[in-house]
Amino acid sequence: MNYRKVICIVGPTGVGKSEIAFHLAKRYDGIIINADSRQLYKGVPIITAQPTFEERSLIPHKLYACLDLHEKISAGRWATLAAEQLDSVCHTKIPLLVGGTGLYLRALFDGIVTIPPISTELSLTMEKQAEEKGISFLYNMLKVHDPLYANSIHPNDRQRVLRALTVFYETGKTFTWWHQQVTEAYPATVLRIGIKIPLIELAPLLEKRIDKMFVQGAIKEVITTYKRYFNKDVQNWSGIGYMELLGAIKGEYTFNEAKERWLKNTRSYAKRQLTWFNADKRIIWFCPDQLEDIQKCVENWLS
């Protein structure tokens, strides 16, 4: 099998992944492919920190601003889109996958279970049953439909019990069955470069970036987007920054409070990203200012 060479630049939000990827793409005649769930969406380039028009004119960028906010995306669908991009460029350019959505990269290079989306109506129905009948009742139902999975989790694990039951009622297949349907991994030799700094050092950088987004027009961006999609279901889009600013726009709290919520949620998100990526021992870690070391790593790998 012909394995393509692919570089992944990963790490928490706001650490400088995009800048490093841009430099590497310019140096090694590469192409940048988005691996961030938020940057897939149109209409929110400021609050999702998408590449500028100038950057995109200098280096090819793929899978940025390619979805409307009411469109749903899964790790499996993203992996399909990314594989198509890789197939089209691997023979001419070095592809750099850049982003902080670790599940996307796992789906592409390791394979993933692709469970169809669950209807909102069914989810609400199951939540109501949990409230009215208790999680023990639902766990006993799960033991009837999917005893193997039920025996593998704690009877009081509300989230997993509800998830397994909703999947069964939505698809007619058990969670056990779905976990046996792993997608095929993309055939590639992957260099995984991680960029990180201690969270205590990242926090002020995140605050500075949010301040910059306010200056760039984040409030106007959210107002425009909200008006455009007012009659459409964008509840499934949970982009940090959008919901926090929307609450202030609606008068539920002040813009200073919106900024505080935005920063708090961004810091929590960065922490979750670090937890995810730290668990992957294939990643070679660098600080953002170690550009020369990163270049040496890439050159050794390419040779």
Swiss-Prot record:
Residue ranges of the region described as Interaction with substrate tRNA: 36-39, 159-163
Chain positions recorded as substrate binding sites: 13-18
GO biological process: tRNA modification
Pfam families in alphabetical order: IPPT
Binding residues annotated for ATP, in chain numbering: 11-18
Cofactor: Mg(2+)
Stated family: Belongs to the IPP transferase family.
Domain of life: Bacteria
UniProt name for this protein: tRNA dimethylallyltransferase
Keyword Nucleotide-binding included in the entry's annotation: yes
Function: Catalyzes the transfer of a dimethylallyl group onto the adenine at position 37 in tRNAs that read codons beginning with uridine, leading to the formation of N6-(dimethylallyl)adenosine (i(6)A).
UniProt entry keywords in alphabetical sequence: ATP-binding, Magnesium, Nucleotide-binding, Transferase, tRNA processing
Molecular-function GO terms, alphabetical: ATP binding; tRNA dimethylallyltransferase activity
Reactions performed catalytically: adenosine(37) in tRNA + dimethylallyl diphosphate = N(6)-dimethylallyladenosine(37) in tRNA + diphosphate
The enzyme's E.C. designation: 2.5.1.75
Transferase keyword on record: yes
Subunit field text: Monomer.
UniProt-annotated site: Interaction with substrate tRNA, residues: 101
